[in-house]
């Protein structure tokens, strides 16, 4: 037994290092050098092929514009305040109940203040009335960064925060700010005048992408009451001169146009579902994405 164990232990040690043949784990130094050299060259070639493929692919991709722009989905429509579950519930007599919503709006509108748009090297005036899309050249760096249209906060009227720092919440007349999400190169195509029935008090302009808010269900439509829209030129929509968007590299300070809606006569103590939709020839809607071209929000004003 002892001899067998000694012999077995000796063969195991001999496999690790054979002093007679100068072998380590069954290979000589020259053999180990050759096999290591082979794998270094083999994996080096694989890495070279991989890096070369990536470099060729990067040559076909522009950092300023997506290659497959036609496959990008239409932009989403979202609201501020941005809250979880898109539910707004508050009591006008209790400032704490709507503080979160007001702070959310204040923070969002910070970059729309006049003091944040003073740099004439970055911002430019694009008029006070809606006009056609403003082309700023090709999507490349030949002309450097492109200027951005200013957006005046006072266009948002009662929802600007200039005269009412609570944006109507203390009076039970809440405001929401609506924006169209940024899609690089997207140019909205408004619908024809006769293809859309406009709400009372709203008007058509071929250079405005219209937005309308209504009750989501039949019972909601009766409880929404009246509402007011505030935007450039008092149009309920987004003026086209703010498009197309050239991306963060070419327009890092871009300000998307805004539309404010104030609900002035909501039925109290009732949860009301409100749907807002943008209308356009290239605006789409999806059952899988409830923010594509539209959104709905629940609002409850408590007594």
Swiss-Prot record:
It is a single-pass type II membrane protein. It is found in: Cell membrane; Apical cell membrane; Cell membrane, Sarcolemma. Gene3D superfamilies: 1.20.5.170, Na, k-atpase alpha subunit. One of its GO terms (biological process) is intracellular potassium ion homeostasis. Pfam families: Na_K-ATPase (PF00287). Disulfide bonds join 126-149, 159-175, 213-276. Residues 1-34 are cytoplasmic. Residues 63-303 are extracellular. Glycans are attached at residues 158, 193, 265. Glutathionylated. N-glycosylated. PANTHER family: SODIUM/POTASSIUM-DEPENDENT ATPASE BETA SUBUNIT, SODIUM_POTASSIUM-TRANSPORTING ATPASE SUBUNIT BETA-1. The C-terminal lobe folds into an immunoglobulin-like domain and mediates cell adhesion properties. Belongs to the X(+)/potassium ATPases subunit beta family. This is Sodium/potassium-transporting ATPase subunit beta-1. It comes from Oryctolagus cuniculus. The lineage of its organism: Eukaryota, Metazoa, Chordata, Craniata, Vertebrata.
